[in-house]
Amino acid sequence: MGKTEGQAEEFRARLDKRLDELKWLYSELYHNDENAFQYFLSMLYRMYETRPEPMKQLDREREANPDWCKSNEVLGVMLYTNCFGGTLRGVREHLSYLKESGATYIHLMPLLASPKGRSDGGYAVADFRTVEPELGTMEDFAALAAECHKNGMSVCLDFALNHTSEDHEWARRAKAGEKEFQDRYFFFDNWNIPNDFDRTVPQVFPTTAPGNFSWCDAVQKVVMTTFYPYQWDLNYANPTVFNDMTENLFFLCNQGADIIRLDAVPYIWKALGTTCRNLPQVHTLVRIMRMAVEIVCPVTQLLGEVVMEPSKVVPYFGTLEKPECNVLYNVTTMATTWHTVATRDVRLMKHQLGQIFALPKQYSFLNYLRCHDDIGWGLDYGFLKQFGIDEVGHKHFLNDFFRGYFYGSDARGELYNDDPRIGDARLCGTTASLCGIEAAEYEGNQWKLDRAIRLDIMLHAFLFTLSGVPVIYSGDEIGQRNDYSYHEDPYKWDDSRYLHRGNFSWEDAEKRKDPTTREGRIFTALRELETIRATHEVFRAEADTWIMETYNDHILGIGRYYNGEKLVALFNFDVQDGTAWINEPEEYRNLLNGDRCRATAYGLPAFGFVWLYWSKEEEIEAAKQAESAREAAEKQAEKERKAAARKKAAEEKKAAKQVAEEAAAKAATEEAAAKAEAEEAAAKQAAEEAAARAAAEEAARKTVEAIMKTERAAKKSGTGAKTKRTAKKKGSKK
């Protein structure tokens, strides 16, 4: 089989799996228009056939992993090309920074050709196949996309499918009177039907662009313009519109876009007597687009922009059997997050997240704190009513709080589309400025700055805790503040959204490696959180998630569990320190600092948070370590016991020896004493005997002396002879 035949077979296999449903829905919507359907099918094959081979290879790889965008390793960054890099080539030059930031998904805000001063930030598209010349060319985009893919990054583009610019070729030809192209829009000869529409259709921009219709002088007709007068609504009841717009979508996919953001998708079907929002036909169109994408370019994910109340958002996922959008903006959680910051009360957040956690895990949200758009206060006021909260009054409070008008607030923001008739307005501002960083730095108050940075980081930690795709608005990773220069630009000064659409500050970005700076503190903290999220399976989209009761209305608790891993995430939205009473019996490890603890009662500082982690594997390892420690302790104890026994035996031996030595010494002493006594007695006896002998000798001497004396005396007396005889006689007698 040749390459062409093989590709045709691949296309046919994908089509055959979906053909029955595709034909049924298309025919039902377009009244069995077989010609239109056949054109649609031929267009699908044409776009498949012209798809670059590297993209087809990526399709095949991701067909095996259709949920690639839901990986916990995915981190998105949304940016304006002109603000970030000046041009598409400039963005390409800064890919290393985005990679350093951890981005694996880059959303390039509207970059298609649109008329200056009438662009609605790029959403009034004049040509879906041409890049705005100031930003570069379509070839530049394709080169950027290819470079992103080489670096493991996906690319998202906006696709404004509800309308075109009045400068689009179709609109120009409609103005020229060509009915075929007028039929691609909604034209009316007078205001009768438009007025009927206005009775049920809400206004999108009641102050900056009131009404839903505009007068077209060129043809002397009324044209539907739901958003701005220069944006003409497309008529999707005309199959040519759907076919051609779908082809435009595939053109962008073939240039390298992996994710297509369907802008204003709830508005694309119109019917008199309705709100022209979220009609059943919209879901039919999105379902057809989803199947078409799976046939032509399976790598592509459809991201639905549905800025509505929660009950209107979820249906755009379709069903598990017949899915529509792959991913949806989690606009409700975004708005509820800022409500929680202002009120310091987590009860609405618990209620709202509880509804999301109850949805099928296959439903994936894009989670964000700030984006290019304003913050609309589309909260669950039915739930808030039980606390005595009035919708209009609460919106006033929120807008006052985030403009710094409320006592204790350091937030800095501006209103957008303030409608005094109904007391409604939306809010603009960067994450850093809404957290109080701008005000703290302006005041030079380090204590306030530390607290504001802590809040900023805590909100991002909350963002990363949720299942889905976390996306950071460019500049938030360095705490970039509001840009008030738009007030001086006549093309921008009537649109306060440019407050947070300022140029990326590369000067500030250079400070990201200095841990003492605001930029360095936030950048480093976010990278640490992103790395933890990407390397722990408990953050996977398939994880079980639930609200944990903290018995503290200021502290939000979220639990996650996946494949033997458990996470307890706690967030203190209060300006005071607080305690979460969660009574978790396991021993947890703090993912931020490695400390271990029993999570029964956990204290958090103001705007503090913690990620407590437990895993079966770690528990087993801990048990093994404990067993090893026990065995080691037992061995050590046995060793010490034996050593003690040896020591005792040695001591006893030493003591016995000492006793023996002492006894021997005593015996020797006693023997010596006895000997000494005997010697003394003998000496005494000898002395006595000597004395006796001496006495005897003395007596004898004295006797001799006496005799001699007597003899001498006798001689002297003349009787010597007689005396001698007498003495001799006496001596013999004796």
Residue ranges and their predicted role:
Residues 1-643, 648, 722-725:
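Active-site and adjacent substrate-binding regions of carbohydrate-active enzymes
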